[in-house]
């Protein structure tokens, strides 16, 4: 797929006024037909000094995006037979290439009309003022964002979907705006070796989303497409919604610095969010941090040639998370239509769905973190870096939990459980070689994190529905353990039970004549009986592994030779357990194809590594593998045209 991008920008100004304007156009073709995007971006920024004490500025940006039409079905394309006929003799598309209705033509709806356009306008303003008190200043920032989105689709009679419904139309209109207003009062003074930097913040945010949707089928003809929704004679639907949120914040932060040796920061922040319960909208989040710049001490002067900088850091702080949708504290009704009276009159009504119950006691999720770190630099910054150790404890997690259906509902958003994260992060920067014309620098990063669930609902029980287990990571794969592949006439011992193939019943039975694994046959995945009862049940599921890696590493290199620059990055992920999509054969065996080159089990190839192509996994289990991999990415080669050549053309840099 090709991508075309063009951009024009202009900037300039005087000592009092600066400006920048730009316009860009992007046309990106999609890999799949009708999946491209066209984007136009216009921006303008201007800053003006009004005397020596006041500076104001404004920035505007307008973006329009136009998306492709109806995307061809990739899944239907993958499941098609290579012998299928995609077109009729007259050149029109066939609905079903193999004369059966299991897998439609991937382009069966390609002739549908689609218009998807979004427009976004962002306006930001600021004012910086120096107040009459020495060291005191004030800044206010205001940002407004408006986004409109329109989607119109019409499936005419020349499409598979539209032909069955005599035309099908849908339009969606969405209007969203938000604004953020920040006011900062700053005080910065030095008194001898003492330096104080204080900031007070007042912030207000508000969001508003209005959305409406119409759909219908059975139109007289296709001429009006989605522009005449009143013409729909069947399946008319109307939907609309309004979502509003607001957030109010106060913050006070004081930084103290003595002789650049001893540093102390104390912060207090209060946040209020409209979506929480009436008595829990506000929460207070304090933090404190201290640092000791040892390299500034007099007793370290003798090491200055080797140890350029050494700083110890220690901090404790808390922050909040308001990651819930609006109105989760309220009961949320859904609309329905029912027949009333002897004549069966259609009447609109409302009901409380299983997941629509509100929780008026919802409150902020809080994370408290302790961090200890060290910053260092050697040999005049030829080698530098930092090491951080941290422990984070999160309480009152905002999660949807299941409850007994006898309550009339089966899930509710709640503050449940506690989690703990701890780990280490290391960054090293080095200048490996440096001469007049040549420089080679490297950056190494290492990160290790261990997380676990400390508590769920306070009763010591795990949550199997959400796959949350006390003492285990939050994101895990919970499934049956695959020991291998069932073979013909297989027989093995496990947990004191003897499992063998019964040719008469064509089943694998235990010594009591019970089926060990329902539906298993030669070529099926062999599952492990974890609880030792001699048969496979849901109780045999186990934690296969974590979805997050044990640790990650990266190594970046930048090489400069005169005006040439070459850079590349190695990124490594280690100890992550991933679902093996190419092993999940049921997703492929629905069609006429299978993955070429895979070592499938067959009677002639009784491998123990993979199952047969037609195997349908028991209880929808899947396959996993613990993986380590290293990627080479972000390879860049650049050349800076010498300034002596550019200056003749009036160009600053190229």
Segment roles from a protein language model:
Residues 3-24, 28-35, 41-120, 159-176, ...:
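Flexible loop and strand-edge segments within Gram-negative outer membrane beta-barrel domains
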Residues 2-15, 24-26, 106-153, 171-190, ...:
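Outer-membrane beta-barrel transmembrane strands
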Residues 1, 213, 328, 337, ...:
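Conserved small-residue
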Residues 103-113, 120, 231-251, 340-384, ...:
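Outer-membrane beta-barrel signature, preferentially recognizing the C-terminal barrel domain
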Residues 76-107, 152-169, 210-238, 329-357, ...:
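Surface-exposed loop/turn segments flanking beta-strands in extracellular/periplasmic regions
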Residues 13-16, 53, 131-138, 190-196, ...:
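Short loop/turn motifs that connect adjacent beta-strands in outer-membrane beta-barrel proteins
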Residues 14-16, 25-29, 62-66, 144-150, ...:
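Transmembrane beta-strands of outer-membrane beta-barrel pores
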Residues 81, 100-102, 231-232, 273, ...:
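Extracytoplasmic gating/loop element in the C-terminal half of outer-membrane beta-barrel translocons
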């Amino acid at each position: 797929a090709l991508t075309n991008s063009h951009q024009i920008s202009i900037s300039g100004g005087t000592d009092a006024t600066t400006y920048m304007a730009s316009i860009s156009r992007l046309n990106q073709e999609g890999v799949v037909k009708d999946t491209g995007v066209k984007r136009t971006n216009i921006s303008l920024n201007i800053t003006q000094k009004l005397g020596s004490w006041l500076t104001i500025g404004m920035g505007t940006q307008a973006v329009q995006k136009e998306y492709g039409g109806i995307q061809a079905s990739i899944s239907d394309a993958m499941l098609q037979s290579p012998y299928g006929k995609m077109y009729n003799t007259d050149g029109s598309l066939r609905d079903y290439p193999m004369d059966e209705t299991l897998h439609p033509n991937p382009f069966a709806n390609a002739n549908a009309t689609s218009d998807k356009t979004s427009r976004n306008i962002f306006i930001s303003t600021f004012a910086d003022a120096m107040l009459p008190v020495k060291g005191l200043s004030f800044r206010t920032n205001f940002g407004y964002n408006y986004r409109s989105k329109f989607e119109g689709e019409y499936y005419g009679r020349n499409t598979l979907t539209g032909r069955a419904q005599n035309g099908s139309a849908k339009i969606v209109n969405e209007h969203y705006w938000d604004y953020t207003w920040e006011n900062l009062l700053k005080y910065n003074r030095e008194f001898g070796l003492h330096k104080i930097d204080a900031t007070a913040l007042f912030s207000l945010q508000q969001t508003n989303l209005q959305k409406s949707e119409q759909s219908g089928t059975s139109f007289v003809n296709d001429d009006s497409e989605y522009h005449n929704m009143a013409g729909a004679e069947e399946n008319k639907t109307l939907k609309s919604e309004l979502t509003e949120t607001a957030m109010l914040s106060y913050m006070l932060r004081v930084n103290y610095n003595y002789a650049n040796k001893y540093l102390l920061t104390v912060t207090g922040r209060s946040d209020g969010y409209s979506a929480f319960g009436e008595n829990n909208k506000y929460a207070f989040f304090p933090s404190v941090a201290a640092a000791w710049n040892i390299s500034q001490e007099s007793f370290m002067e003798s090491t200055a040639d080797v140890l350029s900088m050494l700083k110890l850091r220690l901090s404790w702080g808390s922050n909040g998370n308001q990651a819930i949708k609006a109105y989760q504290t309220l009961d949320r009704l859904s609309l329905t239509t029912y027949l009333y009276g002897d004549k069966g009159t259609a009447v609109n009504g409302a009901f409380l769905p299983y997941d629509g119950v509100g929780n008026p006691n919802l409150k902020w999720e809080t994370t408290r973190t302790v961090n200890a770190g060290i910053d260092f630099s050697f040999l005049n910054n030829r080698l530098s870096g930092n090491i951080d150790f941290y422990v984070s404890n999160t309480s009152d997690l905002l999660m949807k939990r299941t409850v007994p259906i006898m309550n009339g509902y089966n899930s509710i958003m709640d503050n449940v459980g506690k989690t703990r994260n701890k780990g280490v992060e290391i960054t090293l920067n080095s200048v490996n070689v440096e001469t007049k014309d040549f420089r080679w620098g490297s950056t190494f990063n290492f990160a290790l994190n261990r997380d676990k669930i400390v508590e769920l609902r306070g009763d010591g029980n795990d949550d199997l529905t959400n796959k949350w287990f006390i003492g285990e990571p939050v994101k895990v794969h919970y499934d049956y353990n695959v020991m291998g592949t069932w073979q013909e006439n297989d027989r093995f011992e496990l947990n004191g039970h003897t499992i063998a193939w019964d040719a008469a019943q064509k089943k694998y039975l235990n010594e009591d004549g019970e089926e060990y694994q329902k539906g298993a046959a030669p070529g099926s995945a062999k599952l492990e009986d974890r609880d030792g009862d001699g048969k496979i049940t849901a109780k045999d599921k186990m934690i296969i592994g974590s979805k997050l890696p044990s640790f990650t590493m990266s190594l970046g290199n930048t090489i400069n030779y005169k005006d040439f620059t070459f850079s590349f990055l190695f990124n490594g992920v280690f100890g992550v357990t991933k679902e093996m999509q190419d092993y999940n054969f049921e997703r492929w065996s629905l069609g006429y194809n299978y993955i070429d080159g895979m070592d499938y089990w067959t009677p002639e190839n009784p491998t123990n590594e993979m199952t047969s192509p037609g195997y349908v996994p028991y209880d929808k289990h899947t396959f996993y593998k613990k993986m380590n991999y290293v990627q080479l990415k972000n390879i860049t080669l650049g050349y800076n045209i010498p300034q002596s050549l550019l200056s003749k053309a009036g160009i600053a840099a190229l």
